[in-house]
């Protein structure tokens, strides 16, 4: 008999609106002894069936809903999810010429705690919830059925697993170990991805649309690409006809890959055209400001500054300082392309931070375009938390 949870009276409202999370304070009773990640039936306080969910006794999010239908959570269930997700993305894949894309965007694709990115025939999984871990083999078996030639690699080396009572883990789940370099293509740009050692699952696929949109601002411009990682924005800037691109990052291996990516695309990377600079971006911006060095375009794509609500105030200060510095080194009429991937910081707050940075920089700034995560990272209407990446193009006068 399947274990069950019963909700506190009134707490069924969010479930009826199809939100996939049930918090510990919303549960009045647990029937049976569900294991970590085991599937449970969800009932209202008076016994009306609501959903199938994964139980996570160690987490404040005590249950994550797999389905609002009375169906088994097994290989066949995941096959259906994968087929639906692939179908949703077919137009995007064809339009942008993608060999790297997000197949599963967790809750937004009906798979709580499961992220799967595809790089050629390597499918990289992050399993961040107890339910995902419990169903790991069924998830892998379903991937193999849907994509028979696939290799599956796990990158669950993420601290959030501890909140679910899980250890961090990585490794081959099916097929071959990924090579050091897997080359993908997007919008005609080739990019080398290090699946095993790179950030996240290897690359920032969510910024693909923003990279493409950035091209219209860079022709014949001096561009500073901050937190460049393996050069994604820098590659598009070179493709867009930038006069010169400085890629700045604290990681030398990432910069080496950025240079390799530029060569892979046969871009001119003479020192007059492309620079790969190992530097702390905060210090570098202050040095440029103090030296009077100016740019026409500054691209500001920092790592996530806020992992929790307790870190949000500090993150706000960090975003304000770094954008203020960027504004101070822009030529009059220059463009600031700035982004935040912190889900806790909504677009309204981020816009206010940019406005505060403009005051501190003593520059007049106009918002001219807004950006968000790429189209293969959808946001379900019932799960607004799925919208996390936001950005602005700003004209700095």
From Swiss-Prot:
Keywords: Cytoplasm, Methyltransferase, RNA-binding, rRNA processing, S-adenosyl-L-methionine, Transferase. The keyword rRNA processing applies. It catalyses: cytidine(1962) in 23S rRNA + S-adenosyl-L-methionine = 5-methylcytidine(1962) in 23S rRNA + S-adenosyl-L-homocysteine + H(+). It holds the Pfam family PUA_3. Its EC number is 2.1.1.191. InterPro entries: PUA (IPR002478), PUA-like_sf (IPR015947), PUA_sf (IPR036974), RLMI (IPR023542), RlmI-like_PUA (IPR041532), SAM-dep_methyl-trfase (IPR019614), SAM-dependent_MTases_sf (IPR029063). GO terms for molecular function: RNA binding; rRNA (cytosine) methyltransferase activity. Residues 2-79 form the PUA domain. It is an enzyme of class 2 (transferase). It is found in: Cytoplasm. It comes from the Bacteria. One of its GO terms (cellular component) is cytoplasm. Belongs to the methyltransferase superfamily. RlmI family. Specifically methylates the cytosine at position 1962 (m5C1962) of 23S rRNA. This is Ribosomal RNA large subunit methyltransferase I. It comes from Vibrio campbellii (strain ATCC BAA-1116). The gene is rlmI.
């Amino acid at each position: 008999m399947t274990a069950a949870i019963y909700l506190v009276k009134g707490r069924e409202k969010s479930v009826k609106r199809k939100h996939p999370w049930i918090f510990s304070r919303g549960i009045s009773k647990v029937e049976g002894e569900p294991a970590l990640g085991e599937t449970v039936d969800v009932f209202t306080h008076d016994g009306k069936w609501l959903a199938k969910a994964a139980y996570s006794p160690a987490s404040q999010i005590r249950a994550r809903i797999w389905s609002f239908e009375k169906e088994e959570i097994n290989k066949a269930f995941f096959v259906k999810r994968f087929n639906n997700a692939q179908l949703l993305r077919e137009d995007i894949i064809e339009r942008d010429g993608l060999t790297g894309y997000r197949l599963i965007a967790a809750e937004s694709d009906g798979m709580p705690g499961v992220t799967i990115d595809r790089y050629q025939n390597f499918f990289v999984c992050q399993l961040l919830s107890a339910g995902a871990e419990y169903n790991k083999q069924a998830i892998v078996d379903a991937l193999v059925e849907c994509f028979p030639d696939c290799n599956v690699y796990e990158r669950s080396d993420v601290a959030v697993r501890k909140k679910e009572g899980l250890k961090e883990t990585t490794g081959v789940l099916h097929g071959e170990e990924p090579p050091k370099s897997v080359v993908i293509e997007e919008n005609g740009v080739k990019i080398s991805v290090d699946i095993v050692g790179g950030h996240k699952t290897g690359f920032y696929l969510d910024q693909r649309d923003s990279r493409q949109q950035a091209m219209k601002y860079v022709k014949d411009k001096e561009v500073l690409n901050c937190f460049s990682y393996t050069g994604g924005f820098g590659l598009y800037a070179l493709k867009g006809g930038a006069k010169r691109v400085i890629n700045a990052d604290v990681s030398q291996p990432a910069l080496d890959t950025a240079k390799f990516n530029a060569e892979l695309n046969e871009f001119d990377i003479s020192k007059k055209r492309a620079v790969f600079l190992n530097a702390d971006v905060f210090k570098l911006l202050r040095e440029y400001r103090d030296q009077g060095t100016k740019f026409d375009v500054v691209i500001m794509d920092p790592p996530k500054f806020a992992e929790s609500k307790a870190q949000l105030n500090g993150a706000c200060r960090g975003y304000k300082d770094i954008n203020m510095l960027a504004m101070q080194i822009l030529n009059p009429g220059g463009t600031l392309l700035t982004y935040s991937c912190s889900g806790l910081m909504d677009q309204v707050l981020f816009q206010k931070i940019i406005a505060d940075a403009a005051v501190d920089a003593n520059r007049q700034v106009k918002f001219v375009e807004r950006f968000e995560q790429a189209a293969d990272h959808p946001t379900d209407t019932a799960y607004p938390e799925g919208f996390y990446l936001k950005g602005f193009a700003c004209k700095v006068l």
